[in-house]
Amino acid sequence: MDPRIERLEAVIRARKGADPASSYVASLFAKGTAKIAQKVGEEATETIIAALQEGPDKLTSEAADLLFHLSILLANAGLTFDDILRELERREGVSGIDEKASRKG
Protein backbone atom coordinates (compact mmCIF):
# COMPACT_ATOMS: atom_id res chain seq x y z
CA MET A 1 0.00 0.00 0.00
CA ASP A 2 1.21 3.49 -0.75
CA PRO A 3 2.47 5.10 2.47
CA ARG A 4 0.51 8.28 1.74
CA ILE A 5 -2.74 6.30 1.73
CA GLU A 6 -1.65 4.51 4.92
CA ARG A 7 -1.01 7.90 6.59
CA LEU A 8 -4.38 9.21 5.43
CA GLU A 9 -6.16 6.15 6.83
CA ALA A 10 -4.25 6.45 10.12
CA VAL A 11 -5.20 10.11 10.50
CA ILE A 12 -8.85 9.33 9.77
CA ARG A 13 -8.87 6.48 12.32
CA ALA A 14 -7.22 8.73 14.91
CA ARG A 15 -9.71 11.53 14.37
CA LYS A 16 -12.74 9.24 14.44
CA GLY A 17 -12.90 9.51 18.22
CA ALA A 18 -11.93 13.17 18.42
CA ASP A 19 -14.18 16.01 19.50
CA PRO A 20 -16.57 16.80 16.63
CA ALA A 21 -16.36 20.48 17.57
CA SER A 22 -12.64 20.53 16.80
CA SER A 23 -12.28 17.93 14.02
CA TYR A 24 -13.97 17.96 10.62
CA VAL A 25 -13.45 14.21 10.29
CA ALA A 26 -14.94 13.54 13.73
CA SER A 27 -17.90 15.78 12.89
CA LEU A 28 -18.63 13.71 9.79
CA PHE A 29 -18.42 10.45 11.76
CA ALA A 30 -20.78 11.94 14.36
CA LYS A 31 -23.32 12.82 11.65
CA GLY A 32 -23.38 9.24 10.39
CA THR A 33 -23.26 7.29 7.18
CA ALA A 34 -25.89 9.29 5.30
CA LYS A 35 -24.00 12.57 5.77
CA ILE A 36 -20.66 11.00 4.88
CA ALA A 37 -22.18 9.43 1.76
CA GLN A 38 -23.71 12.78 0.82
CA LYS A 39 -20.27 14.39 1.04
CA VAL A 40 -18.80 11.65 -1.17
CA GLY A 41 -21.56 12.33 -3.70
CA GLU A 42 -20.90 16.06 -3.64
CA GLU A 43 -17.17 15.53 -4.12
CA ALA A 44 -17.80 13.04 -6.95
CA THR A 45 -19.99 15.61 -8.70
CA GLU A 46 -17.33 18.30 -8.26
CA THR A 47 -14.72 15.90 -9.65
CA ILE A 48 -16.86 15.22 -12.72
CA ILE A 49 -17.41 18.94 -13.30
CA ALA A 50 -13.68 19.58 -12.97
CA ALA A 51 -12.95 16.82 -15.50
CA LEU A 52 -15.38 18.31 -17.99
CA GLN A 53 -14.84 22.03 -17.49
CA GLU A 54 -11.59 22.70 -15.63
CA GLY A 55 -7.91 21.99 -16.10
CA PRO A 56 -5.77 19.25 -14.60
CA ASP A 57 -4.96 21.24 -11.44
CA LYS A 58 -8.63 21.61 -10.51
CA LEU A 59 -9.30 17.96 -11.36
CA THR A 60 -6.40 16.90 -9.16
CA SER A 61 -7.72 18.99 -6.28
CA GLU A 62 -11.26 17.66 -6.58
CA ALA A 63 -10.04 14.07 -6.96
CA ALA A 64 -8.05 14.50 -3.73
CA ASP A 65 -11.20 15.74 -1.97
CA LEU A 66 -13.11 12.74 -3.32
CA LEU A 67 -10.43 10.30 -2.15
CA PHE A 68 -10.37 11.93 1.29
CA HIS A 69 -14.12 11.68 1.76
CA LEU A 70 -14.21 8.15 0.32
CA SER A 71 -11.58 7.22 2.92
CA ILE A 72 -13.91 8.47 5.65
CA LEU A 73 -16.84 6.51 4.21
CA LEU A 74 -14.74 3.34 4.04
CA ALA A 75 -13.48 3.80 7.60
CA ASN A 76 -17.04 4.34 8.79
CA ALA A 77 -17.91 0.93 7.30
CA GLY A 78 -14.83 -0.71 8.82
CA LEU A 79 -13.10 -0.99 5.44
CA THR A 80 -9.71 0.13 4.14
CA PHE A 81 -8.19 0.70 0.74
CA ASP A 82 -6.55 -2.72 1.12
CA ASP A 83 -10.07 -4.20 1.04
CA ILE A 84 -10.79 -2.31 -2.18
CA LEU A 85 -7.48 -3.37 -3.73
CA ARG A 86 -8.20 -7.02 -2.88
CA GLU A 87 -11.55 -6.71 -4.66
CA LEU A 88 -9.86 -5.19 -7.71
CA GLU A 89 -7.33 -8.03 -7.70
CA ARG A 90 -10.18 -10.54 -7.55
CA ARG A 91 -11.65 -8.96 -10.66
CA GLU A 92 -8.39 -9.00 -12.65
CA GLY A 93 -8.70 -10.95 -15.86
CA VAL A 94 -12.50 -10.97 -15.72
CA SER A 95 -14.43 -9.18 -18.42
CA GLY A 96 -16.22 -6.12 -17.04
CA ILE A 97 -19.42 -7.33 -18.65
CA ASP A 98 -19.07 -10.79 -17.08
CA GLU A 99 -18.16 -9.36 -13.68
CA LYS A 100 -21.18 -7.05 -13.67
CA ALA A 101 -23.48 -9.91 -14.71
CA SER A 102 -22.17 -12.04 -11.83
CA ARG A 103 -23.39 -9.43 -9.32
CA LYS A 104 -27.02 -9.66 -10.47
CA GLY A 105 -27.45 -13.14 -8.95
Tell what function each PLM region has.
Residues 1-63, 67-105:
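Flexible "arm" and connector segments at domain edges
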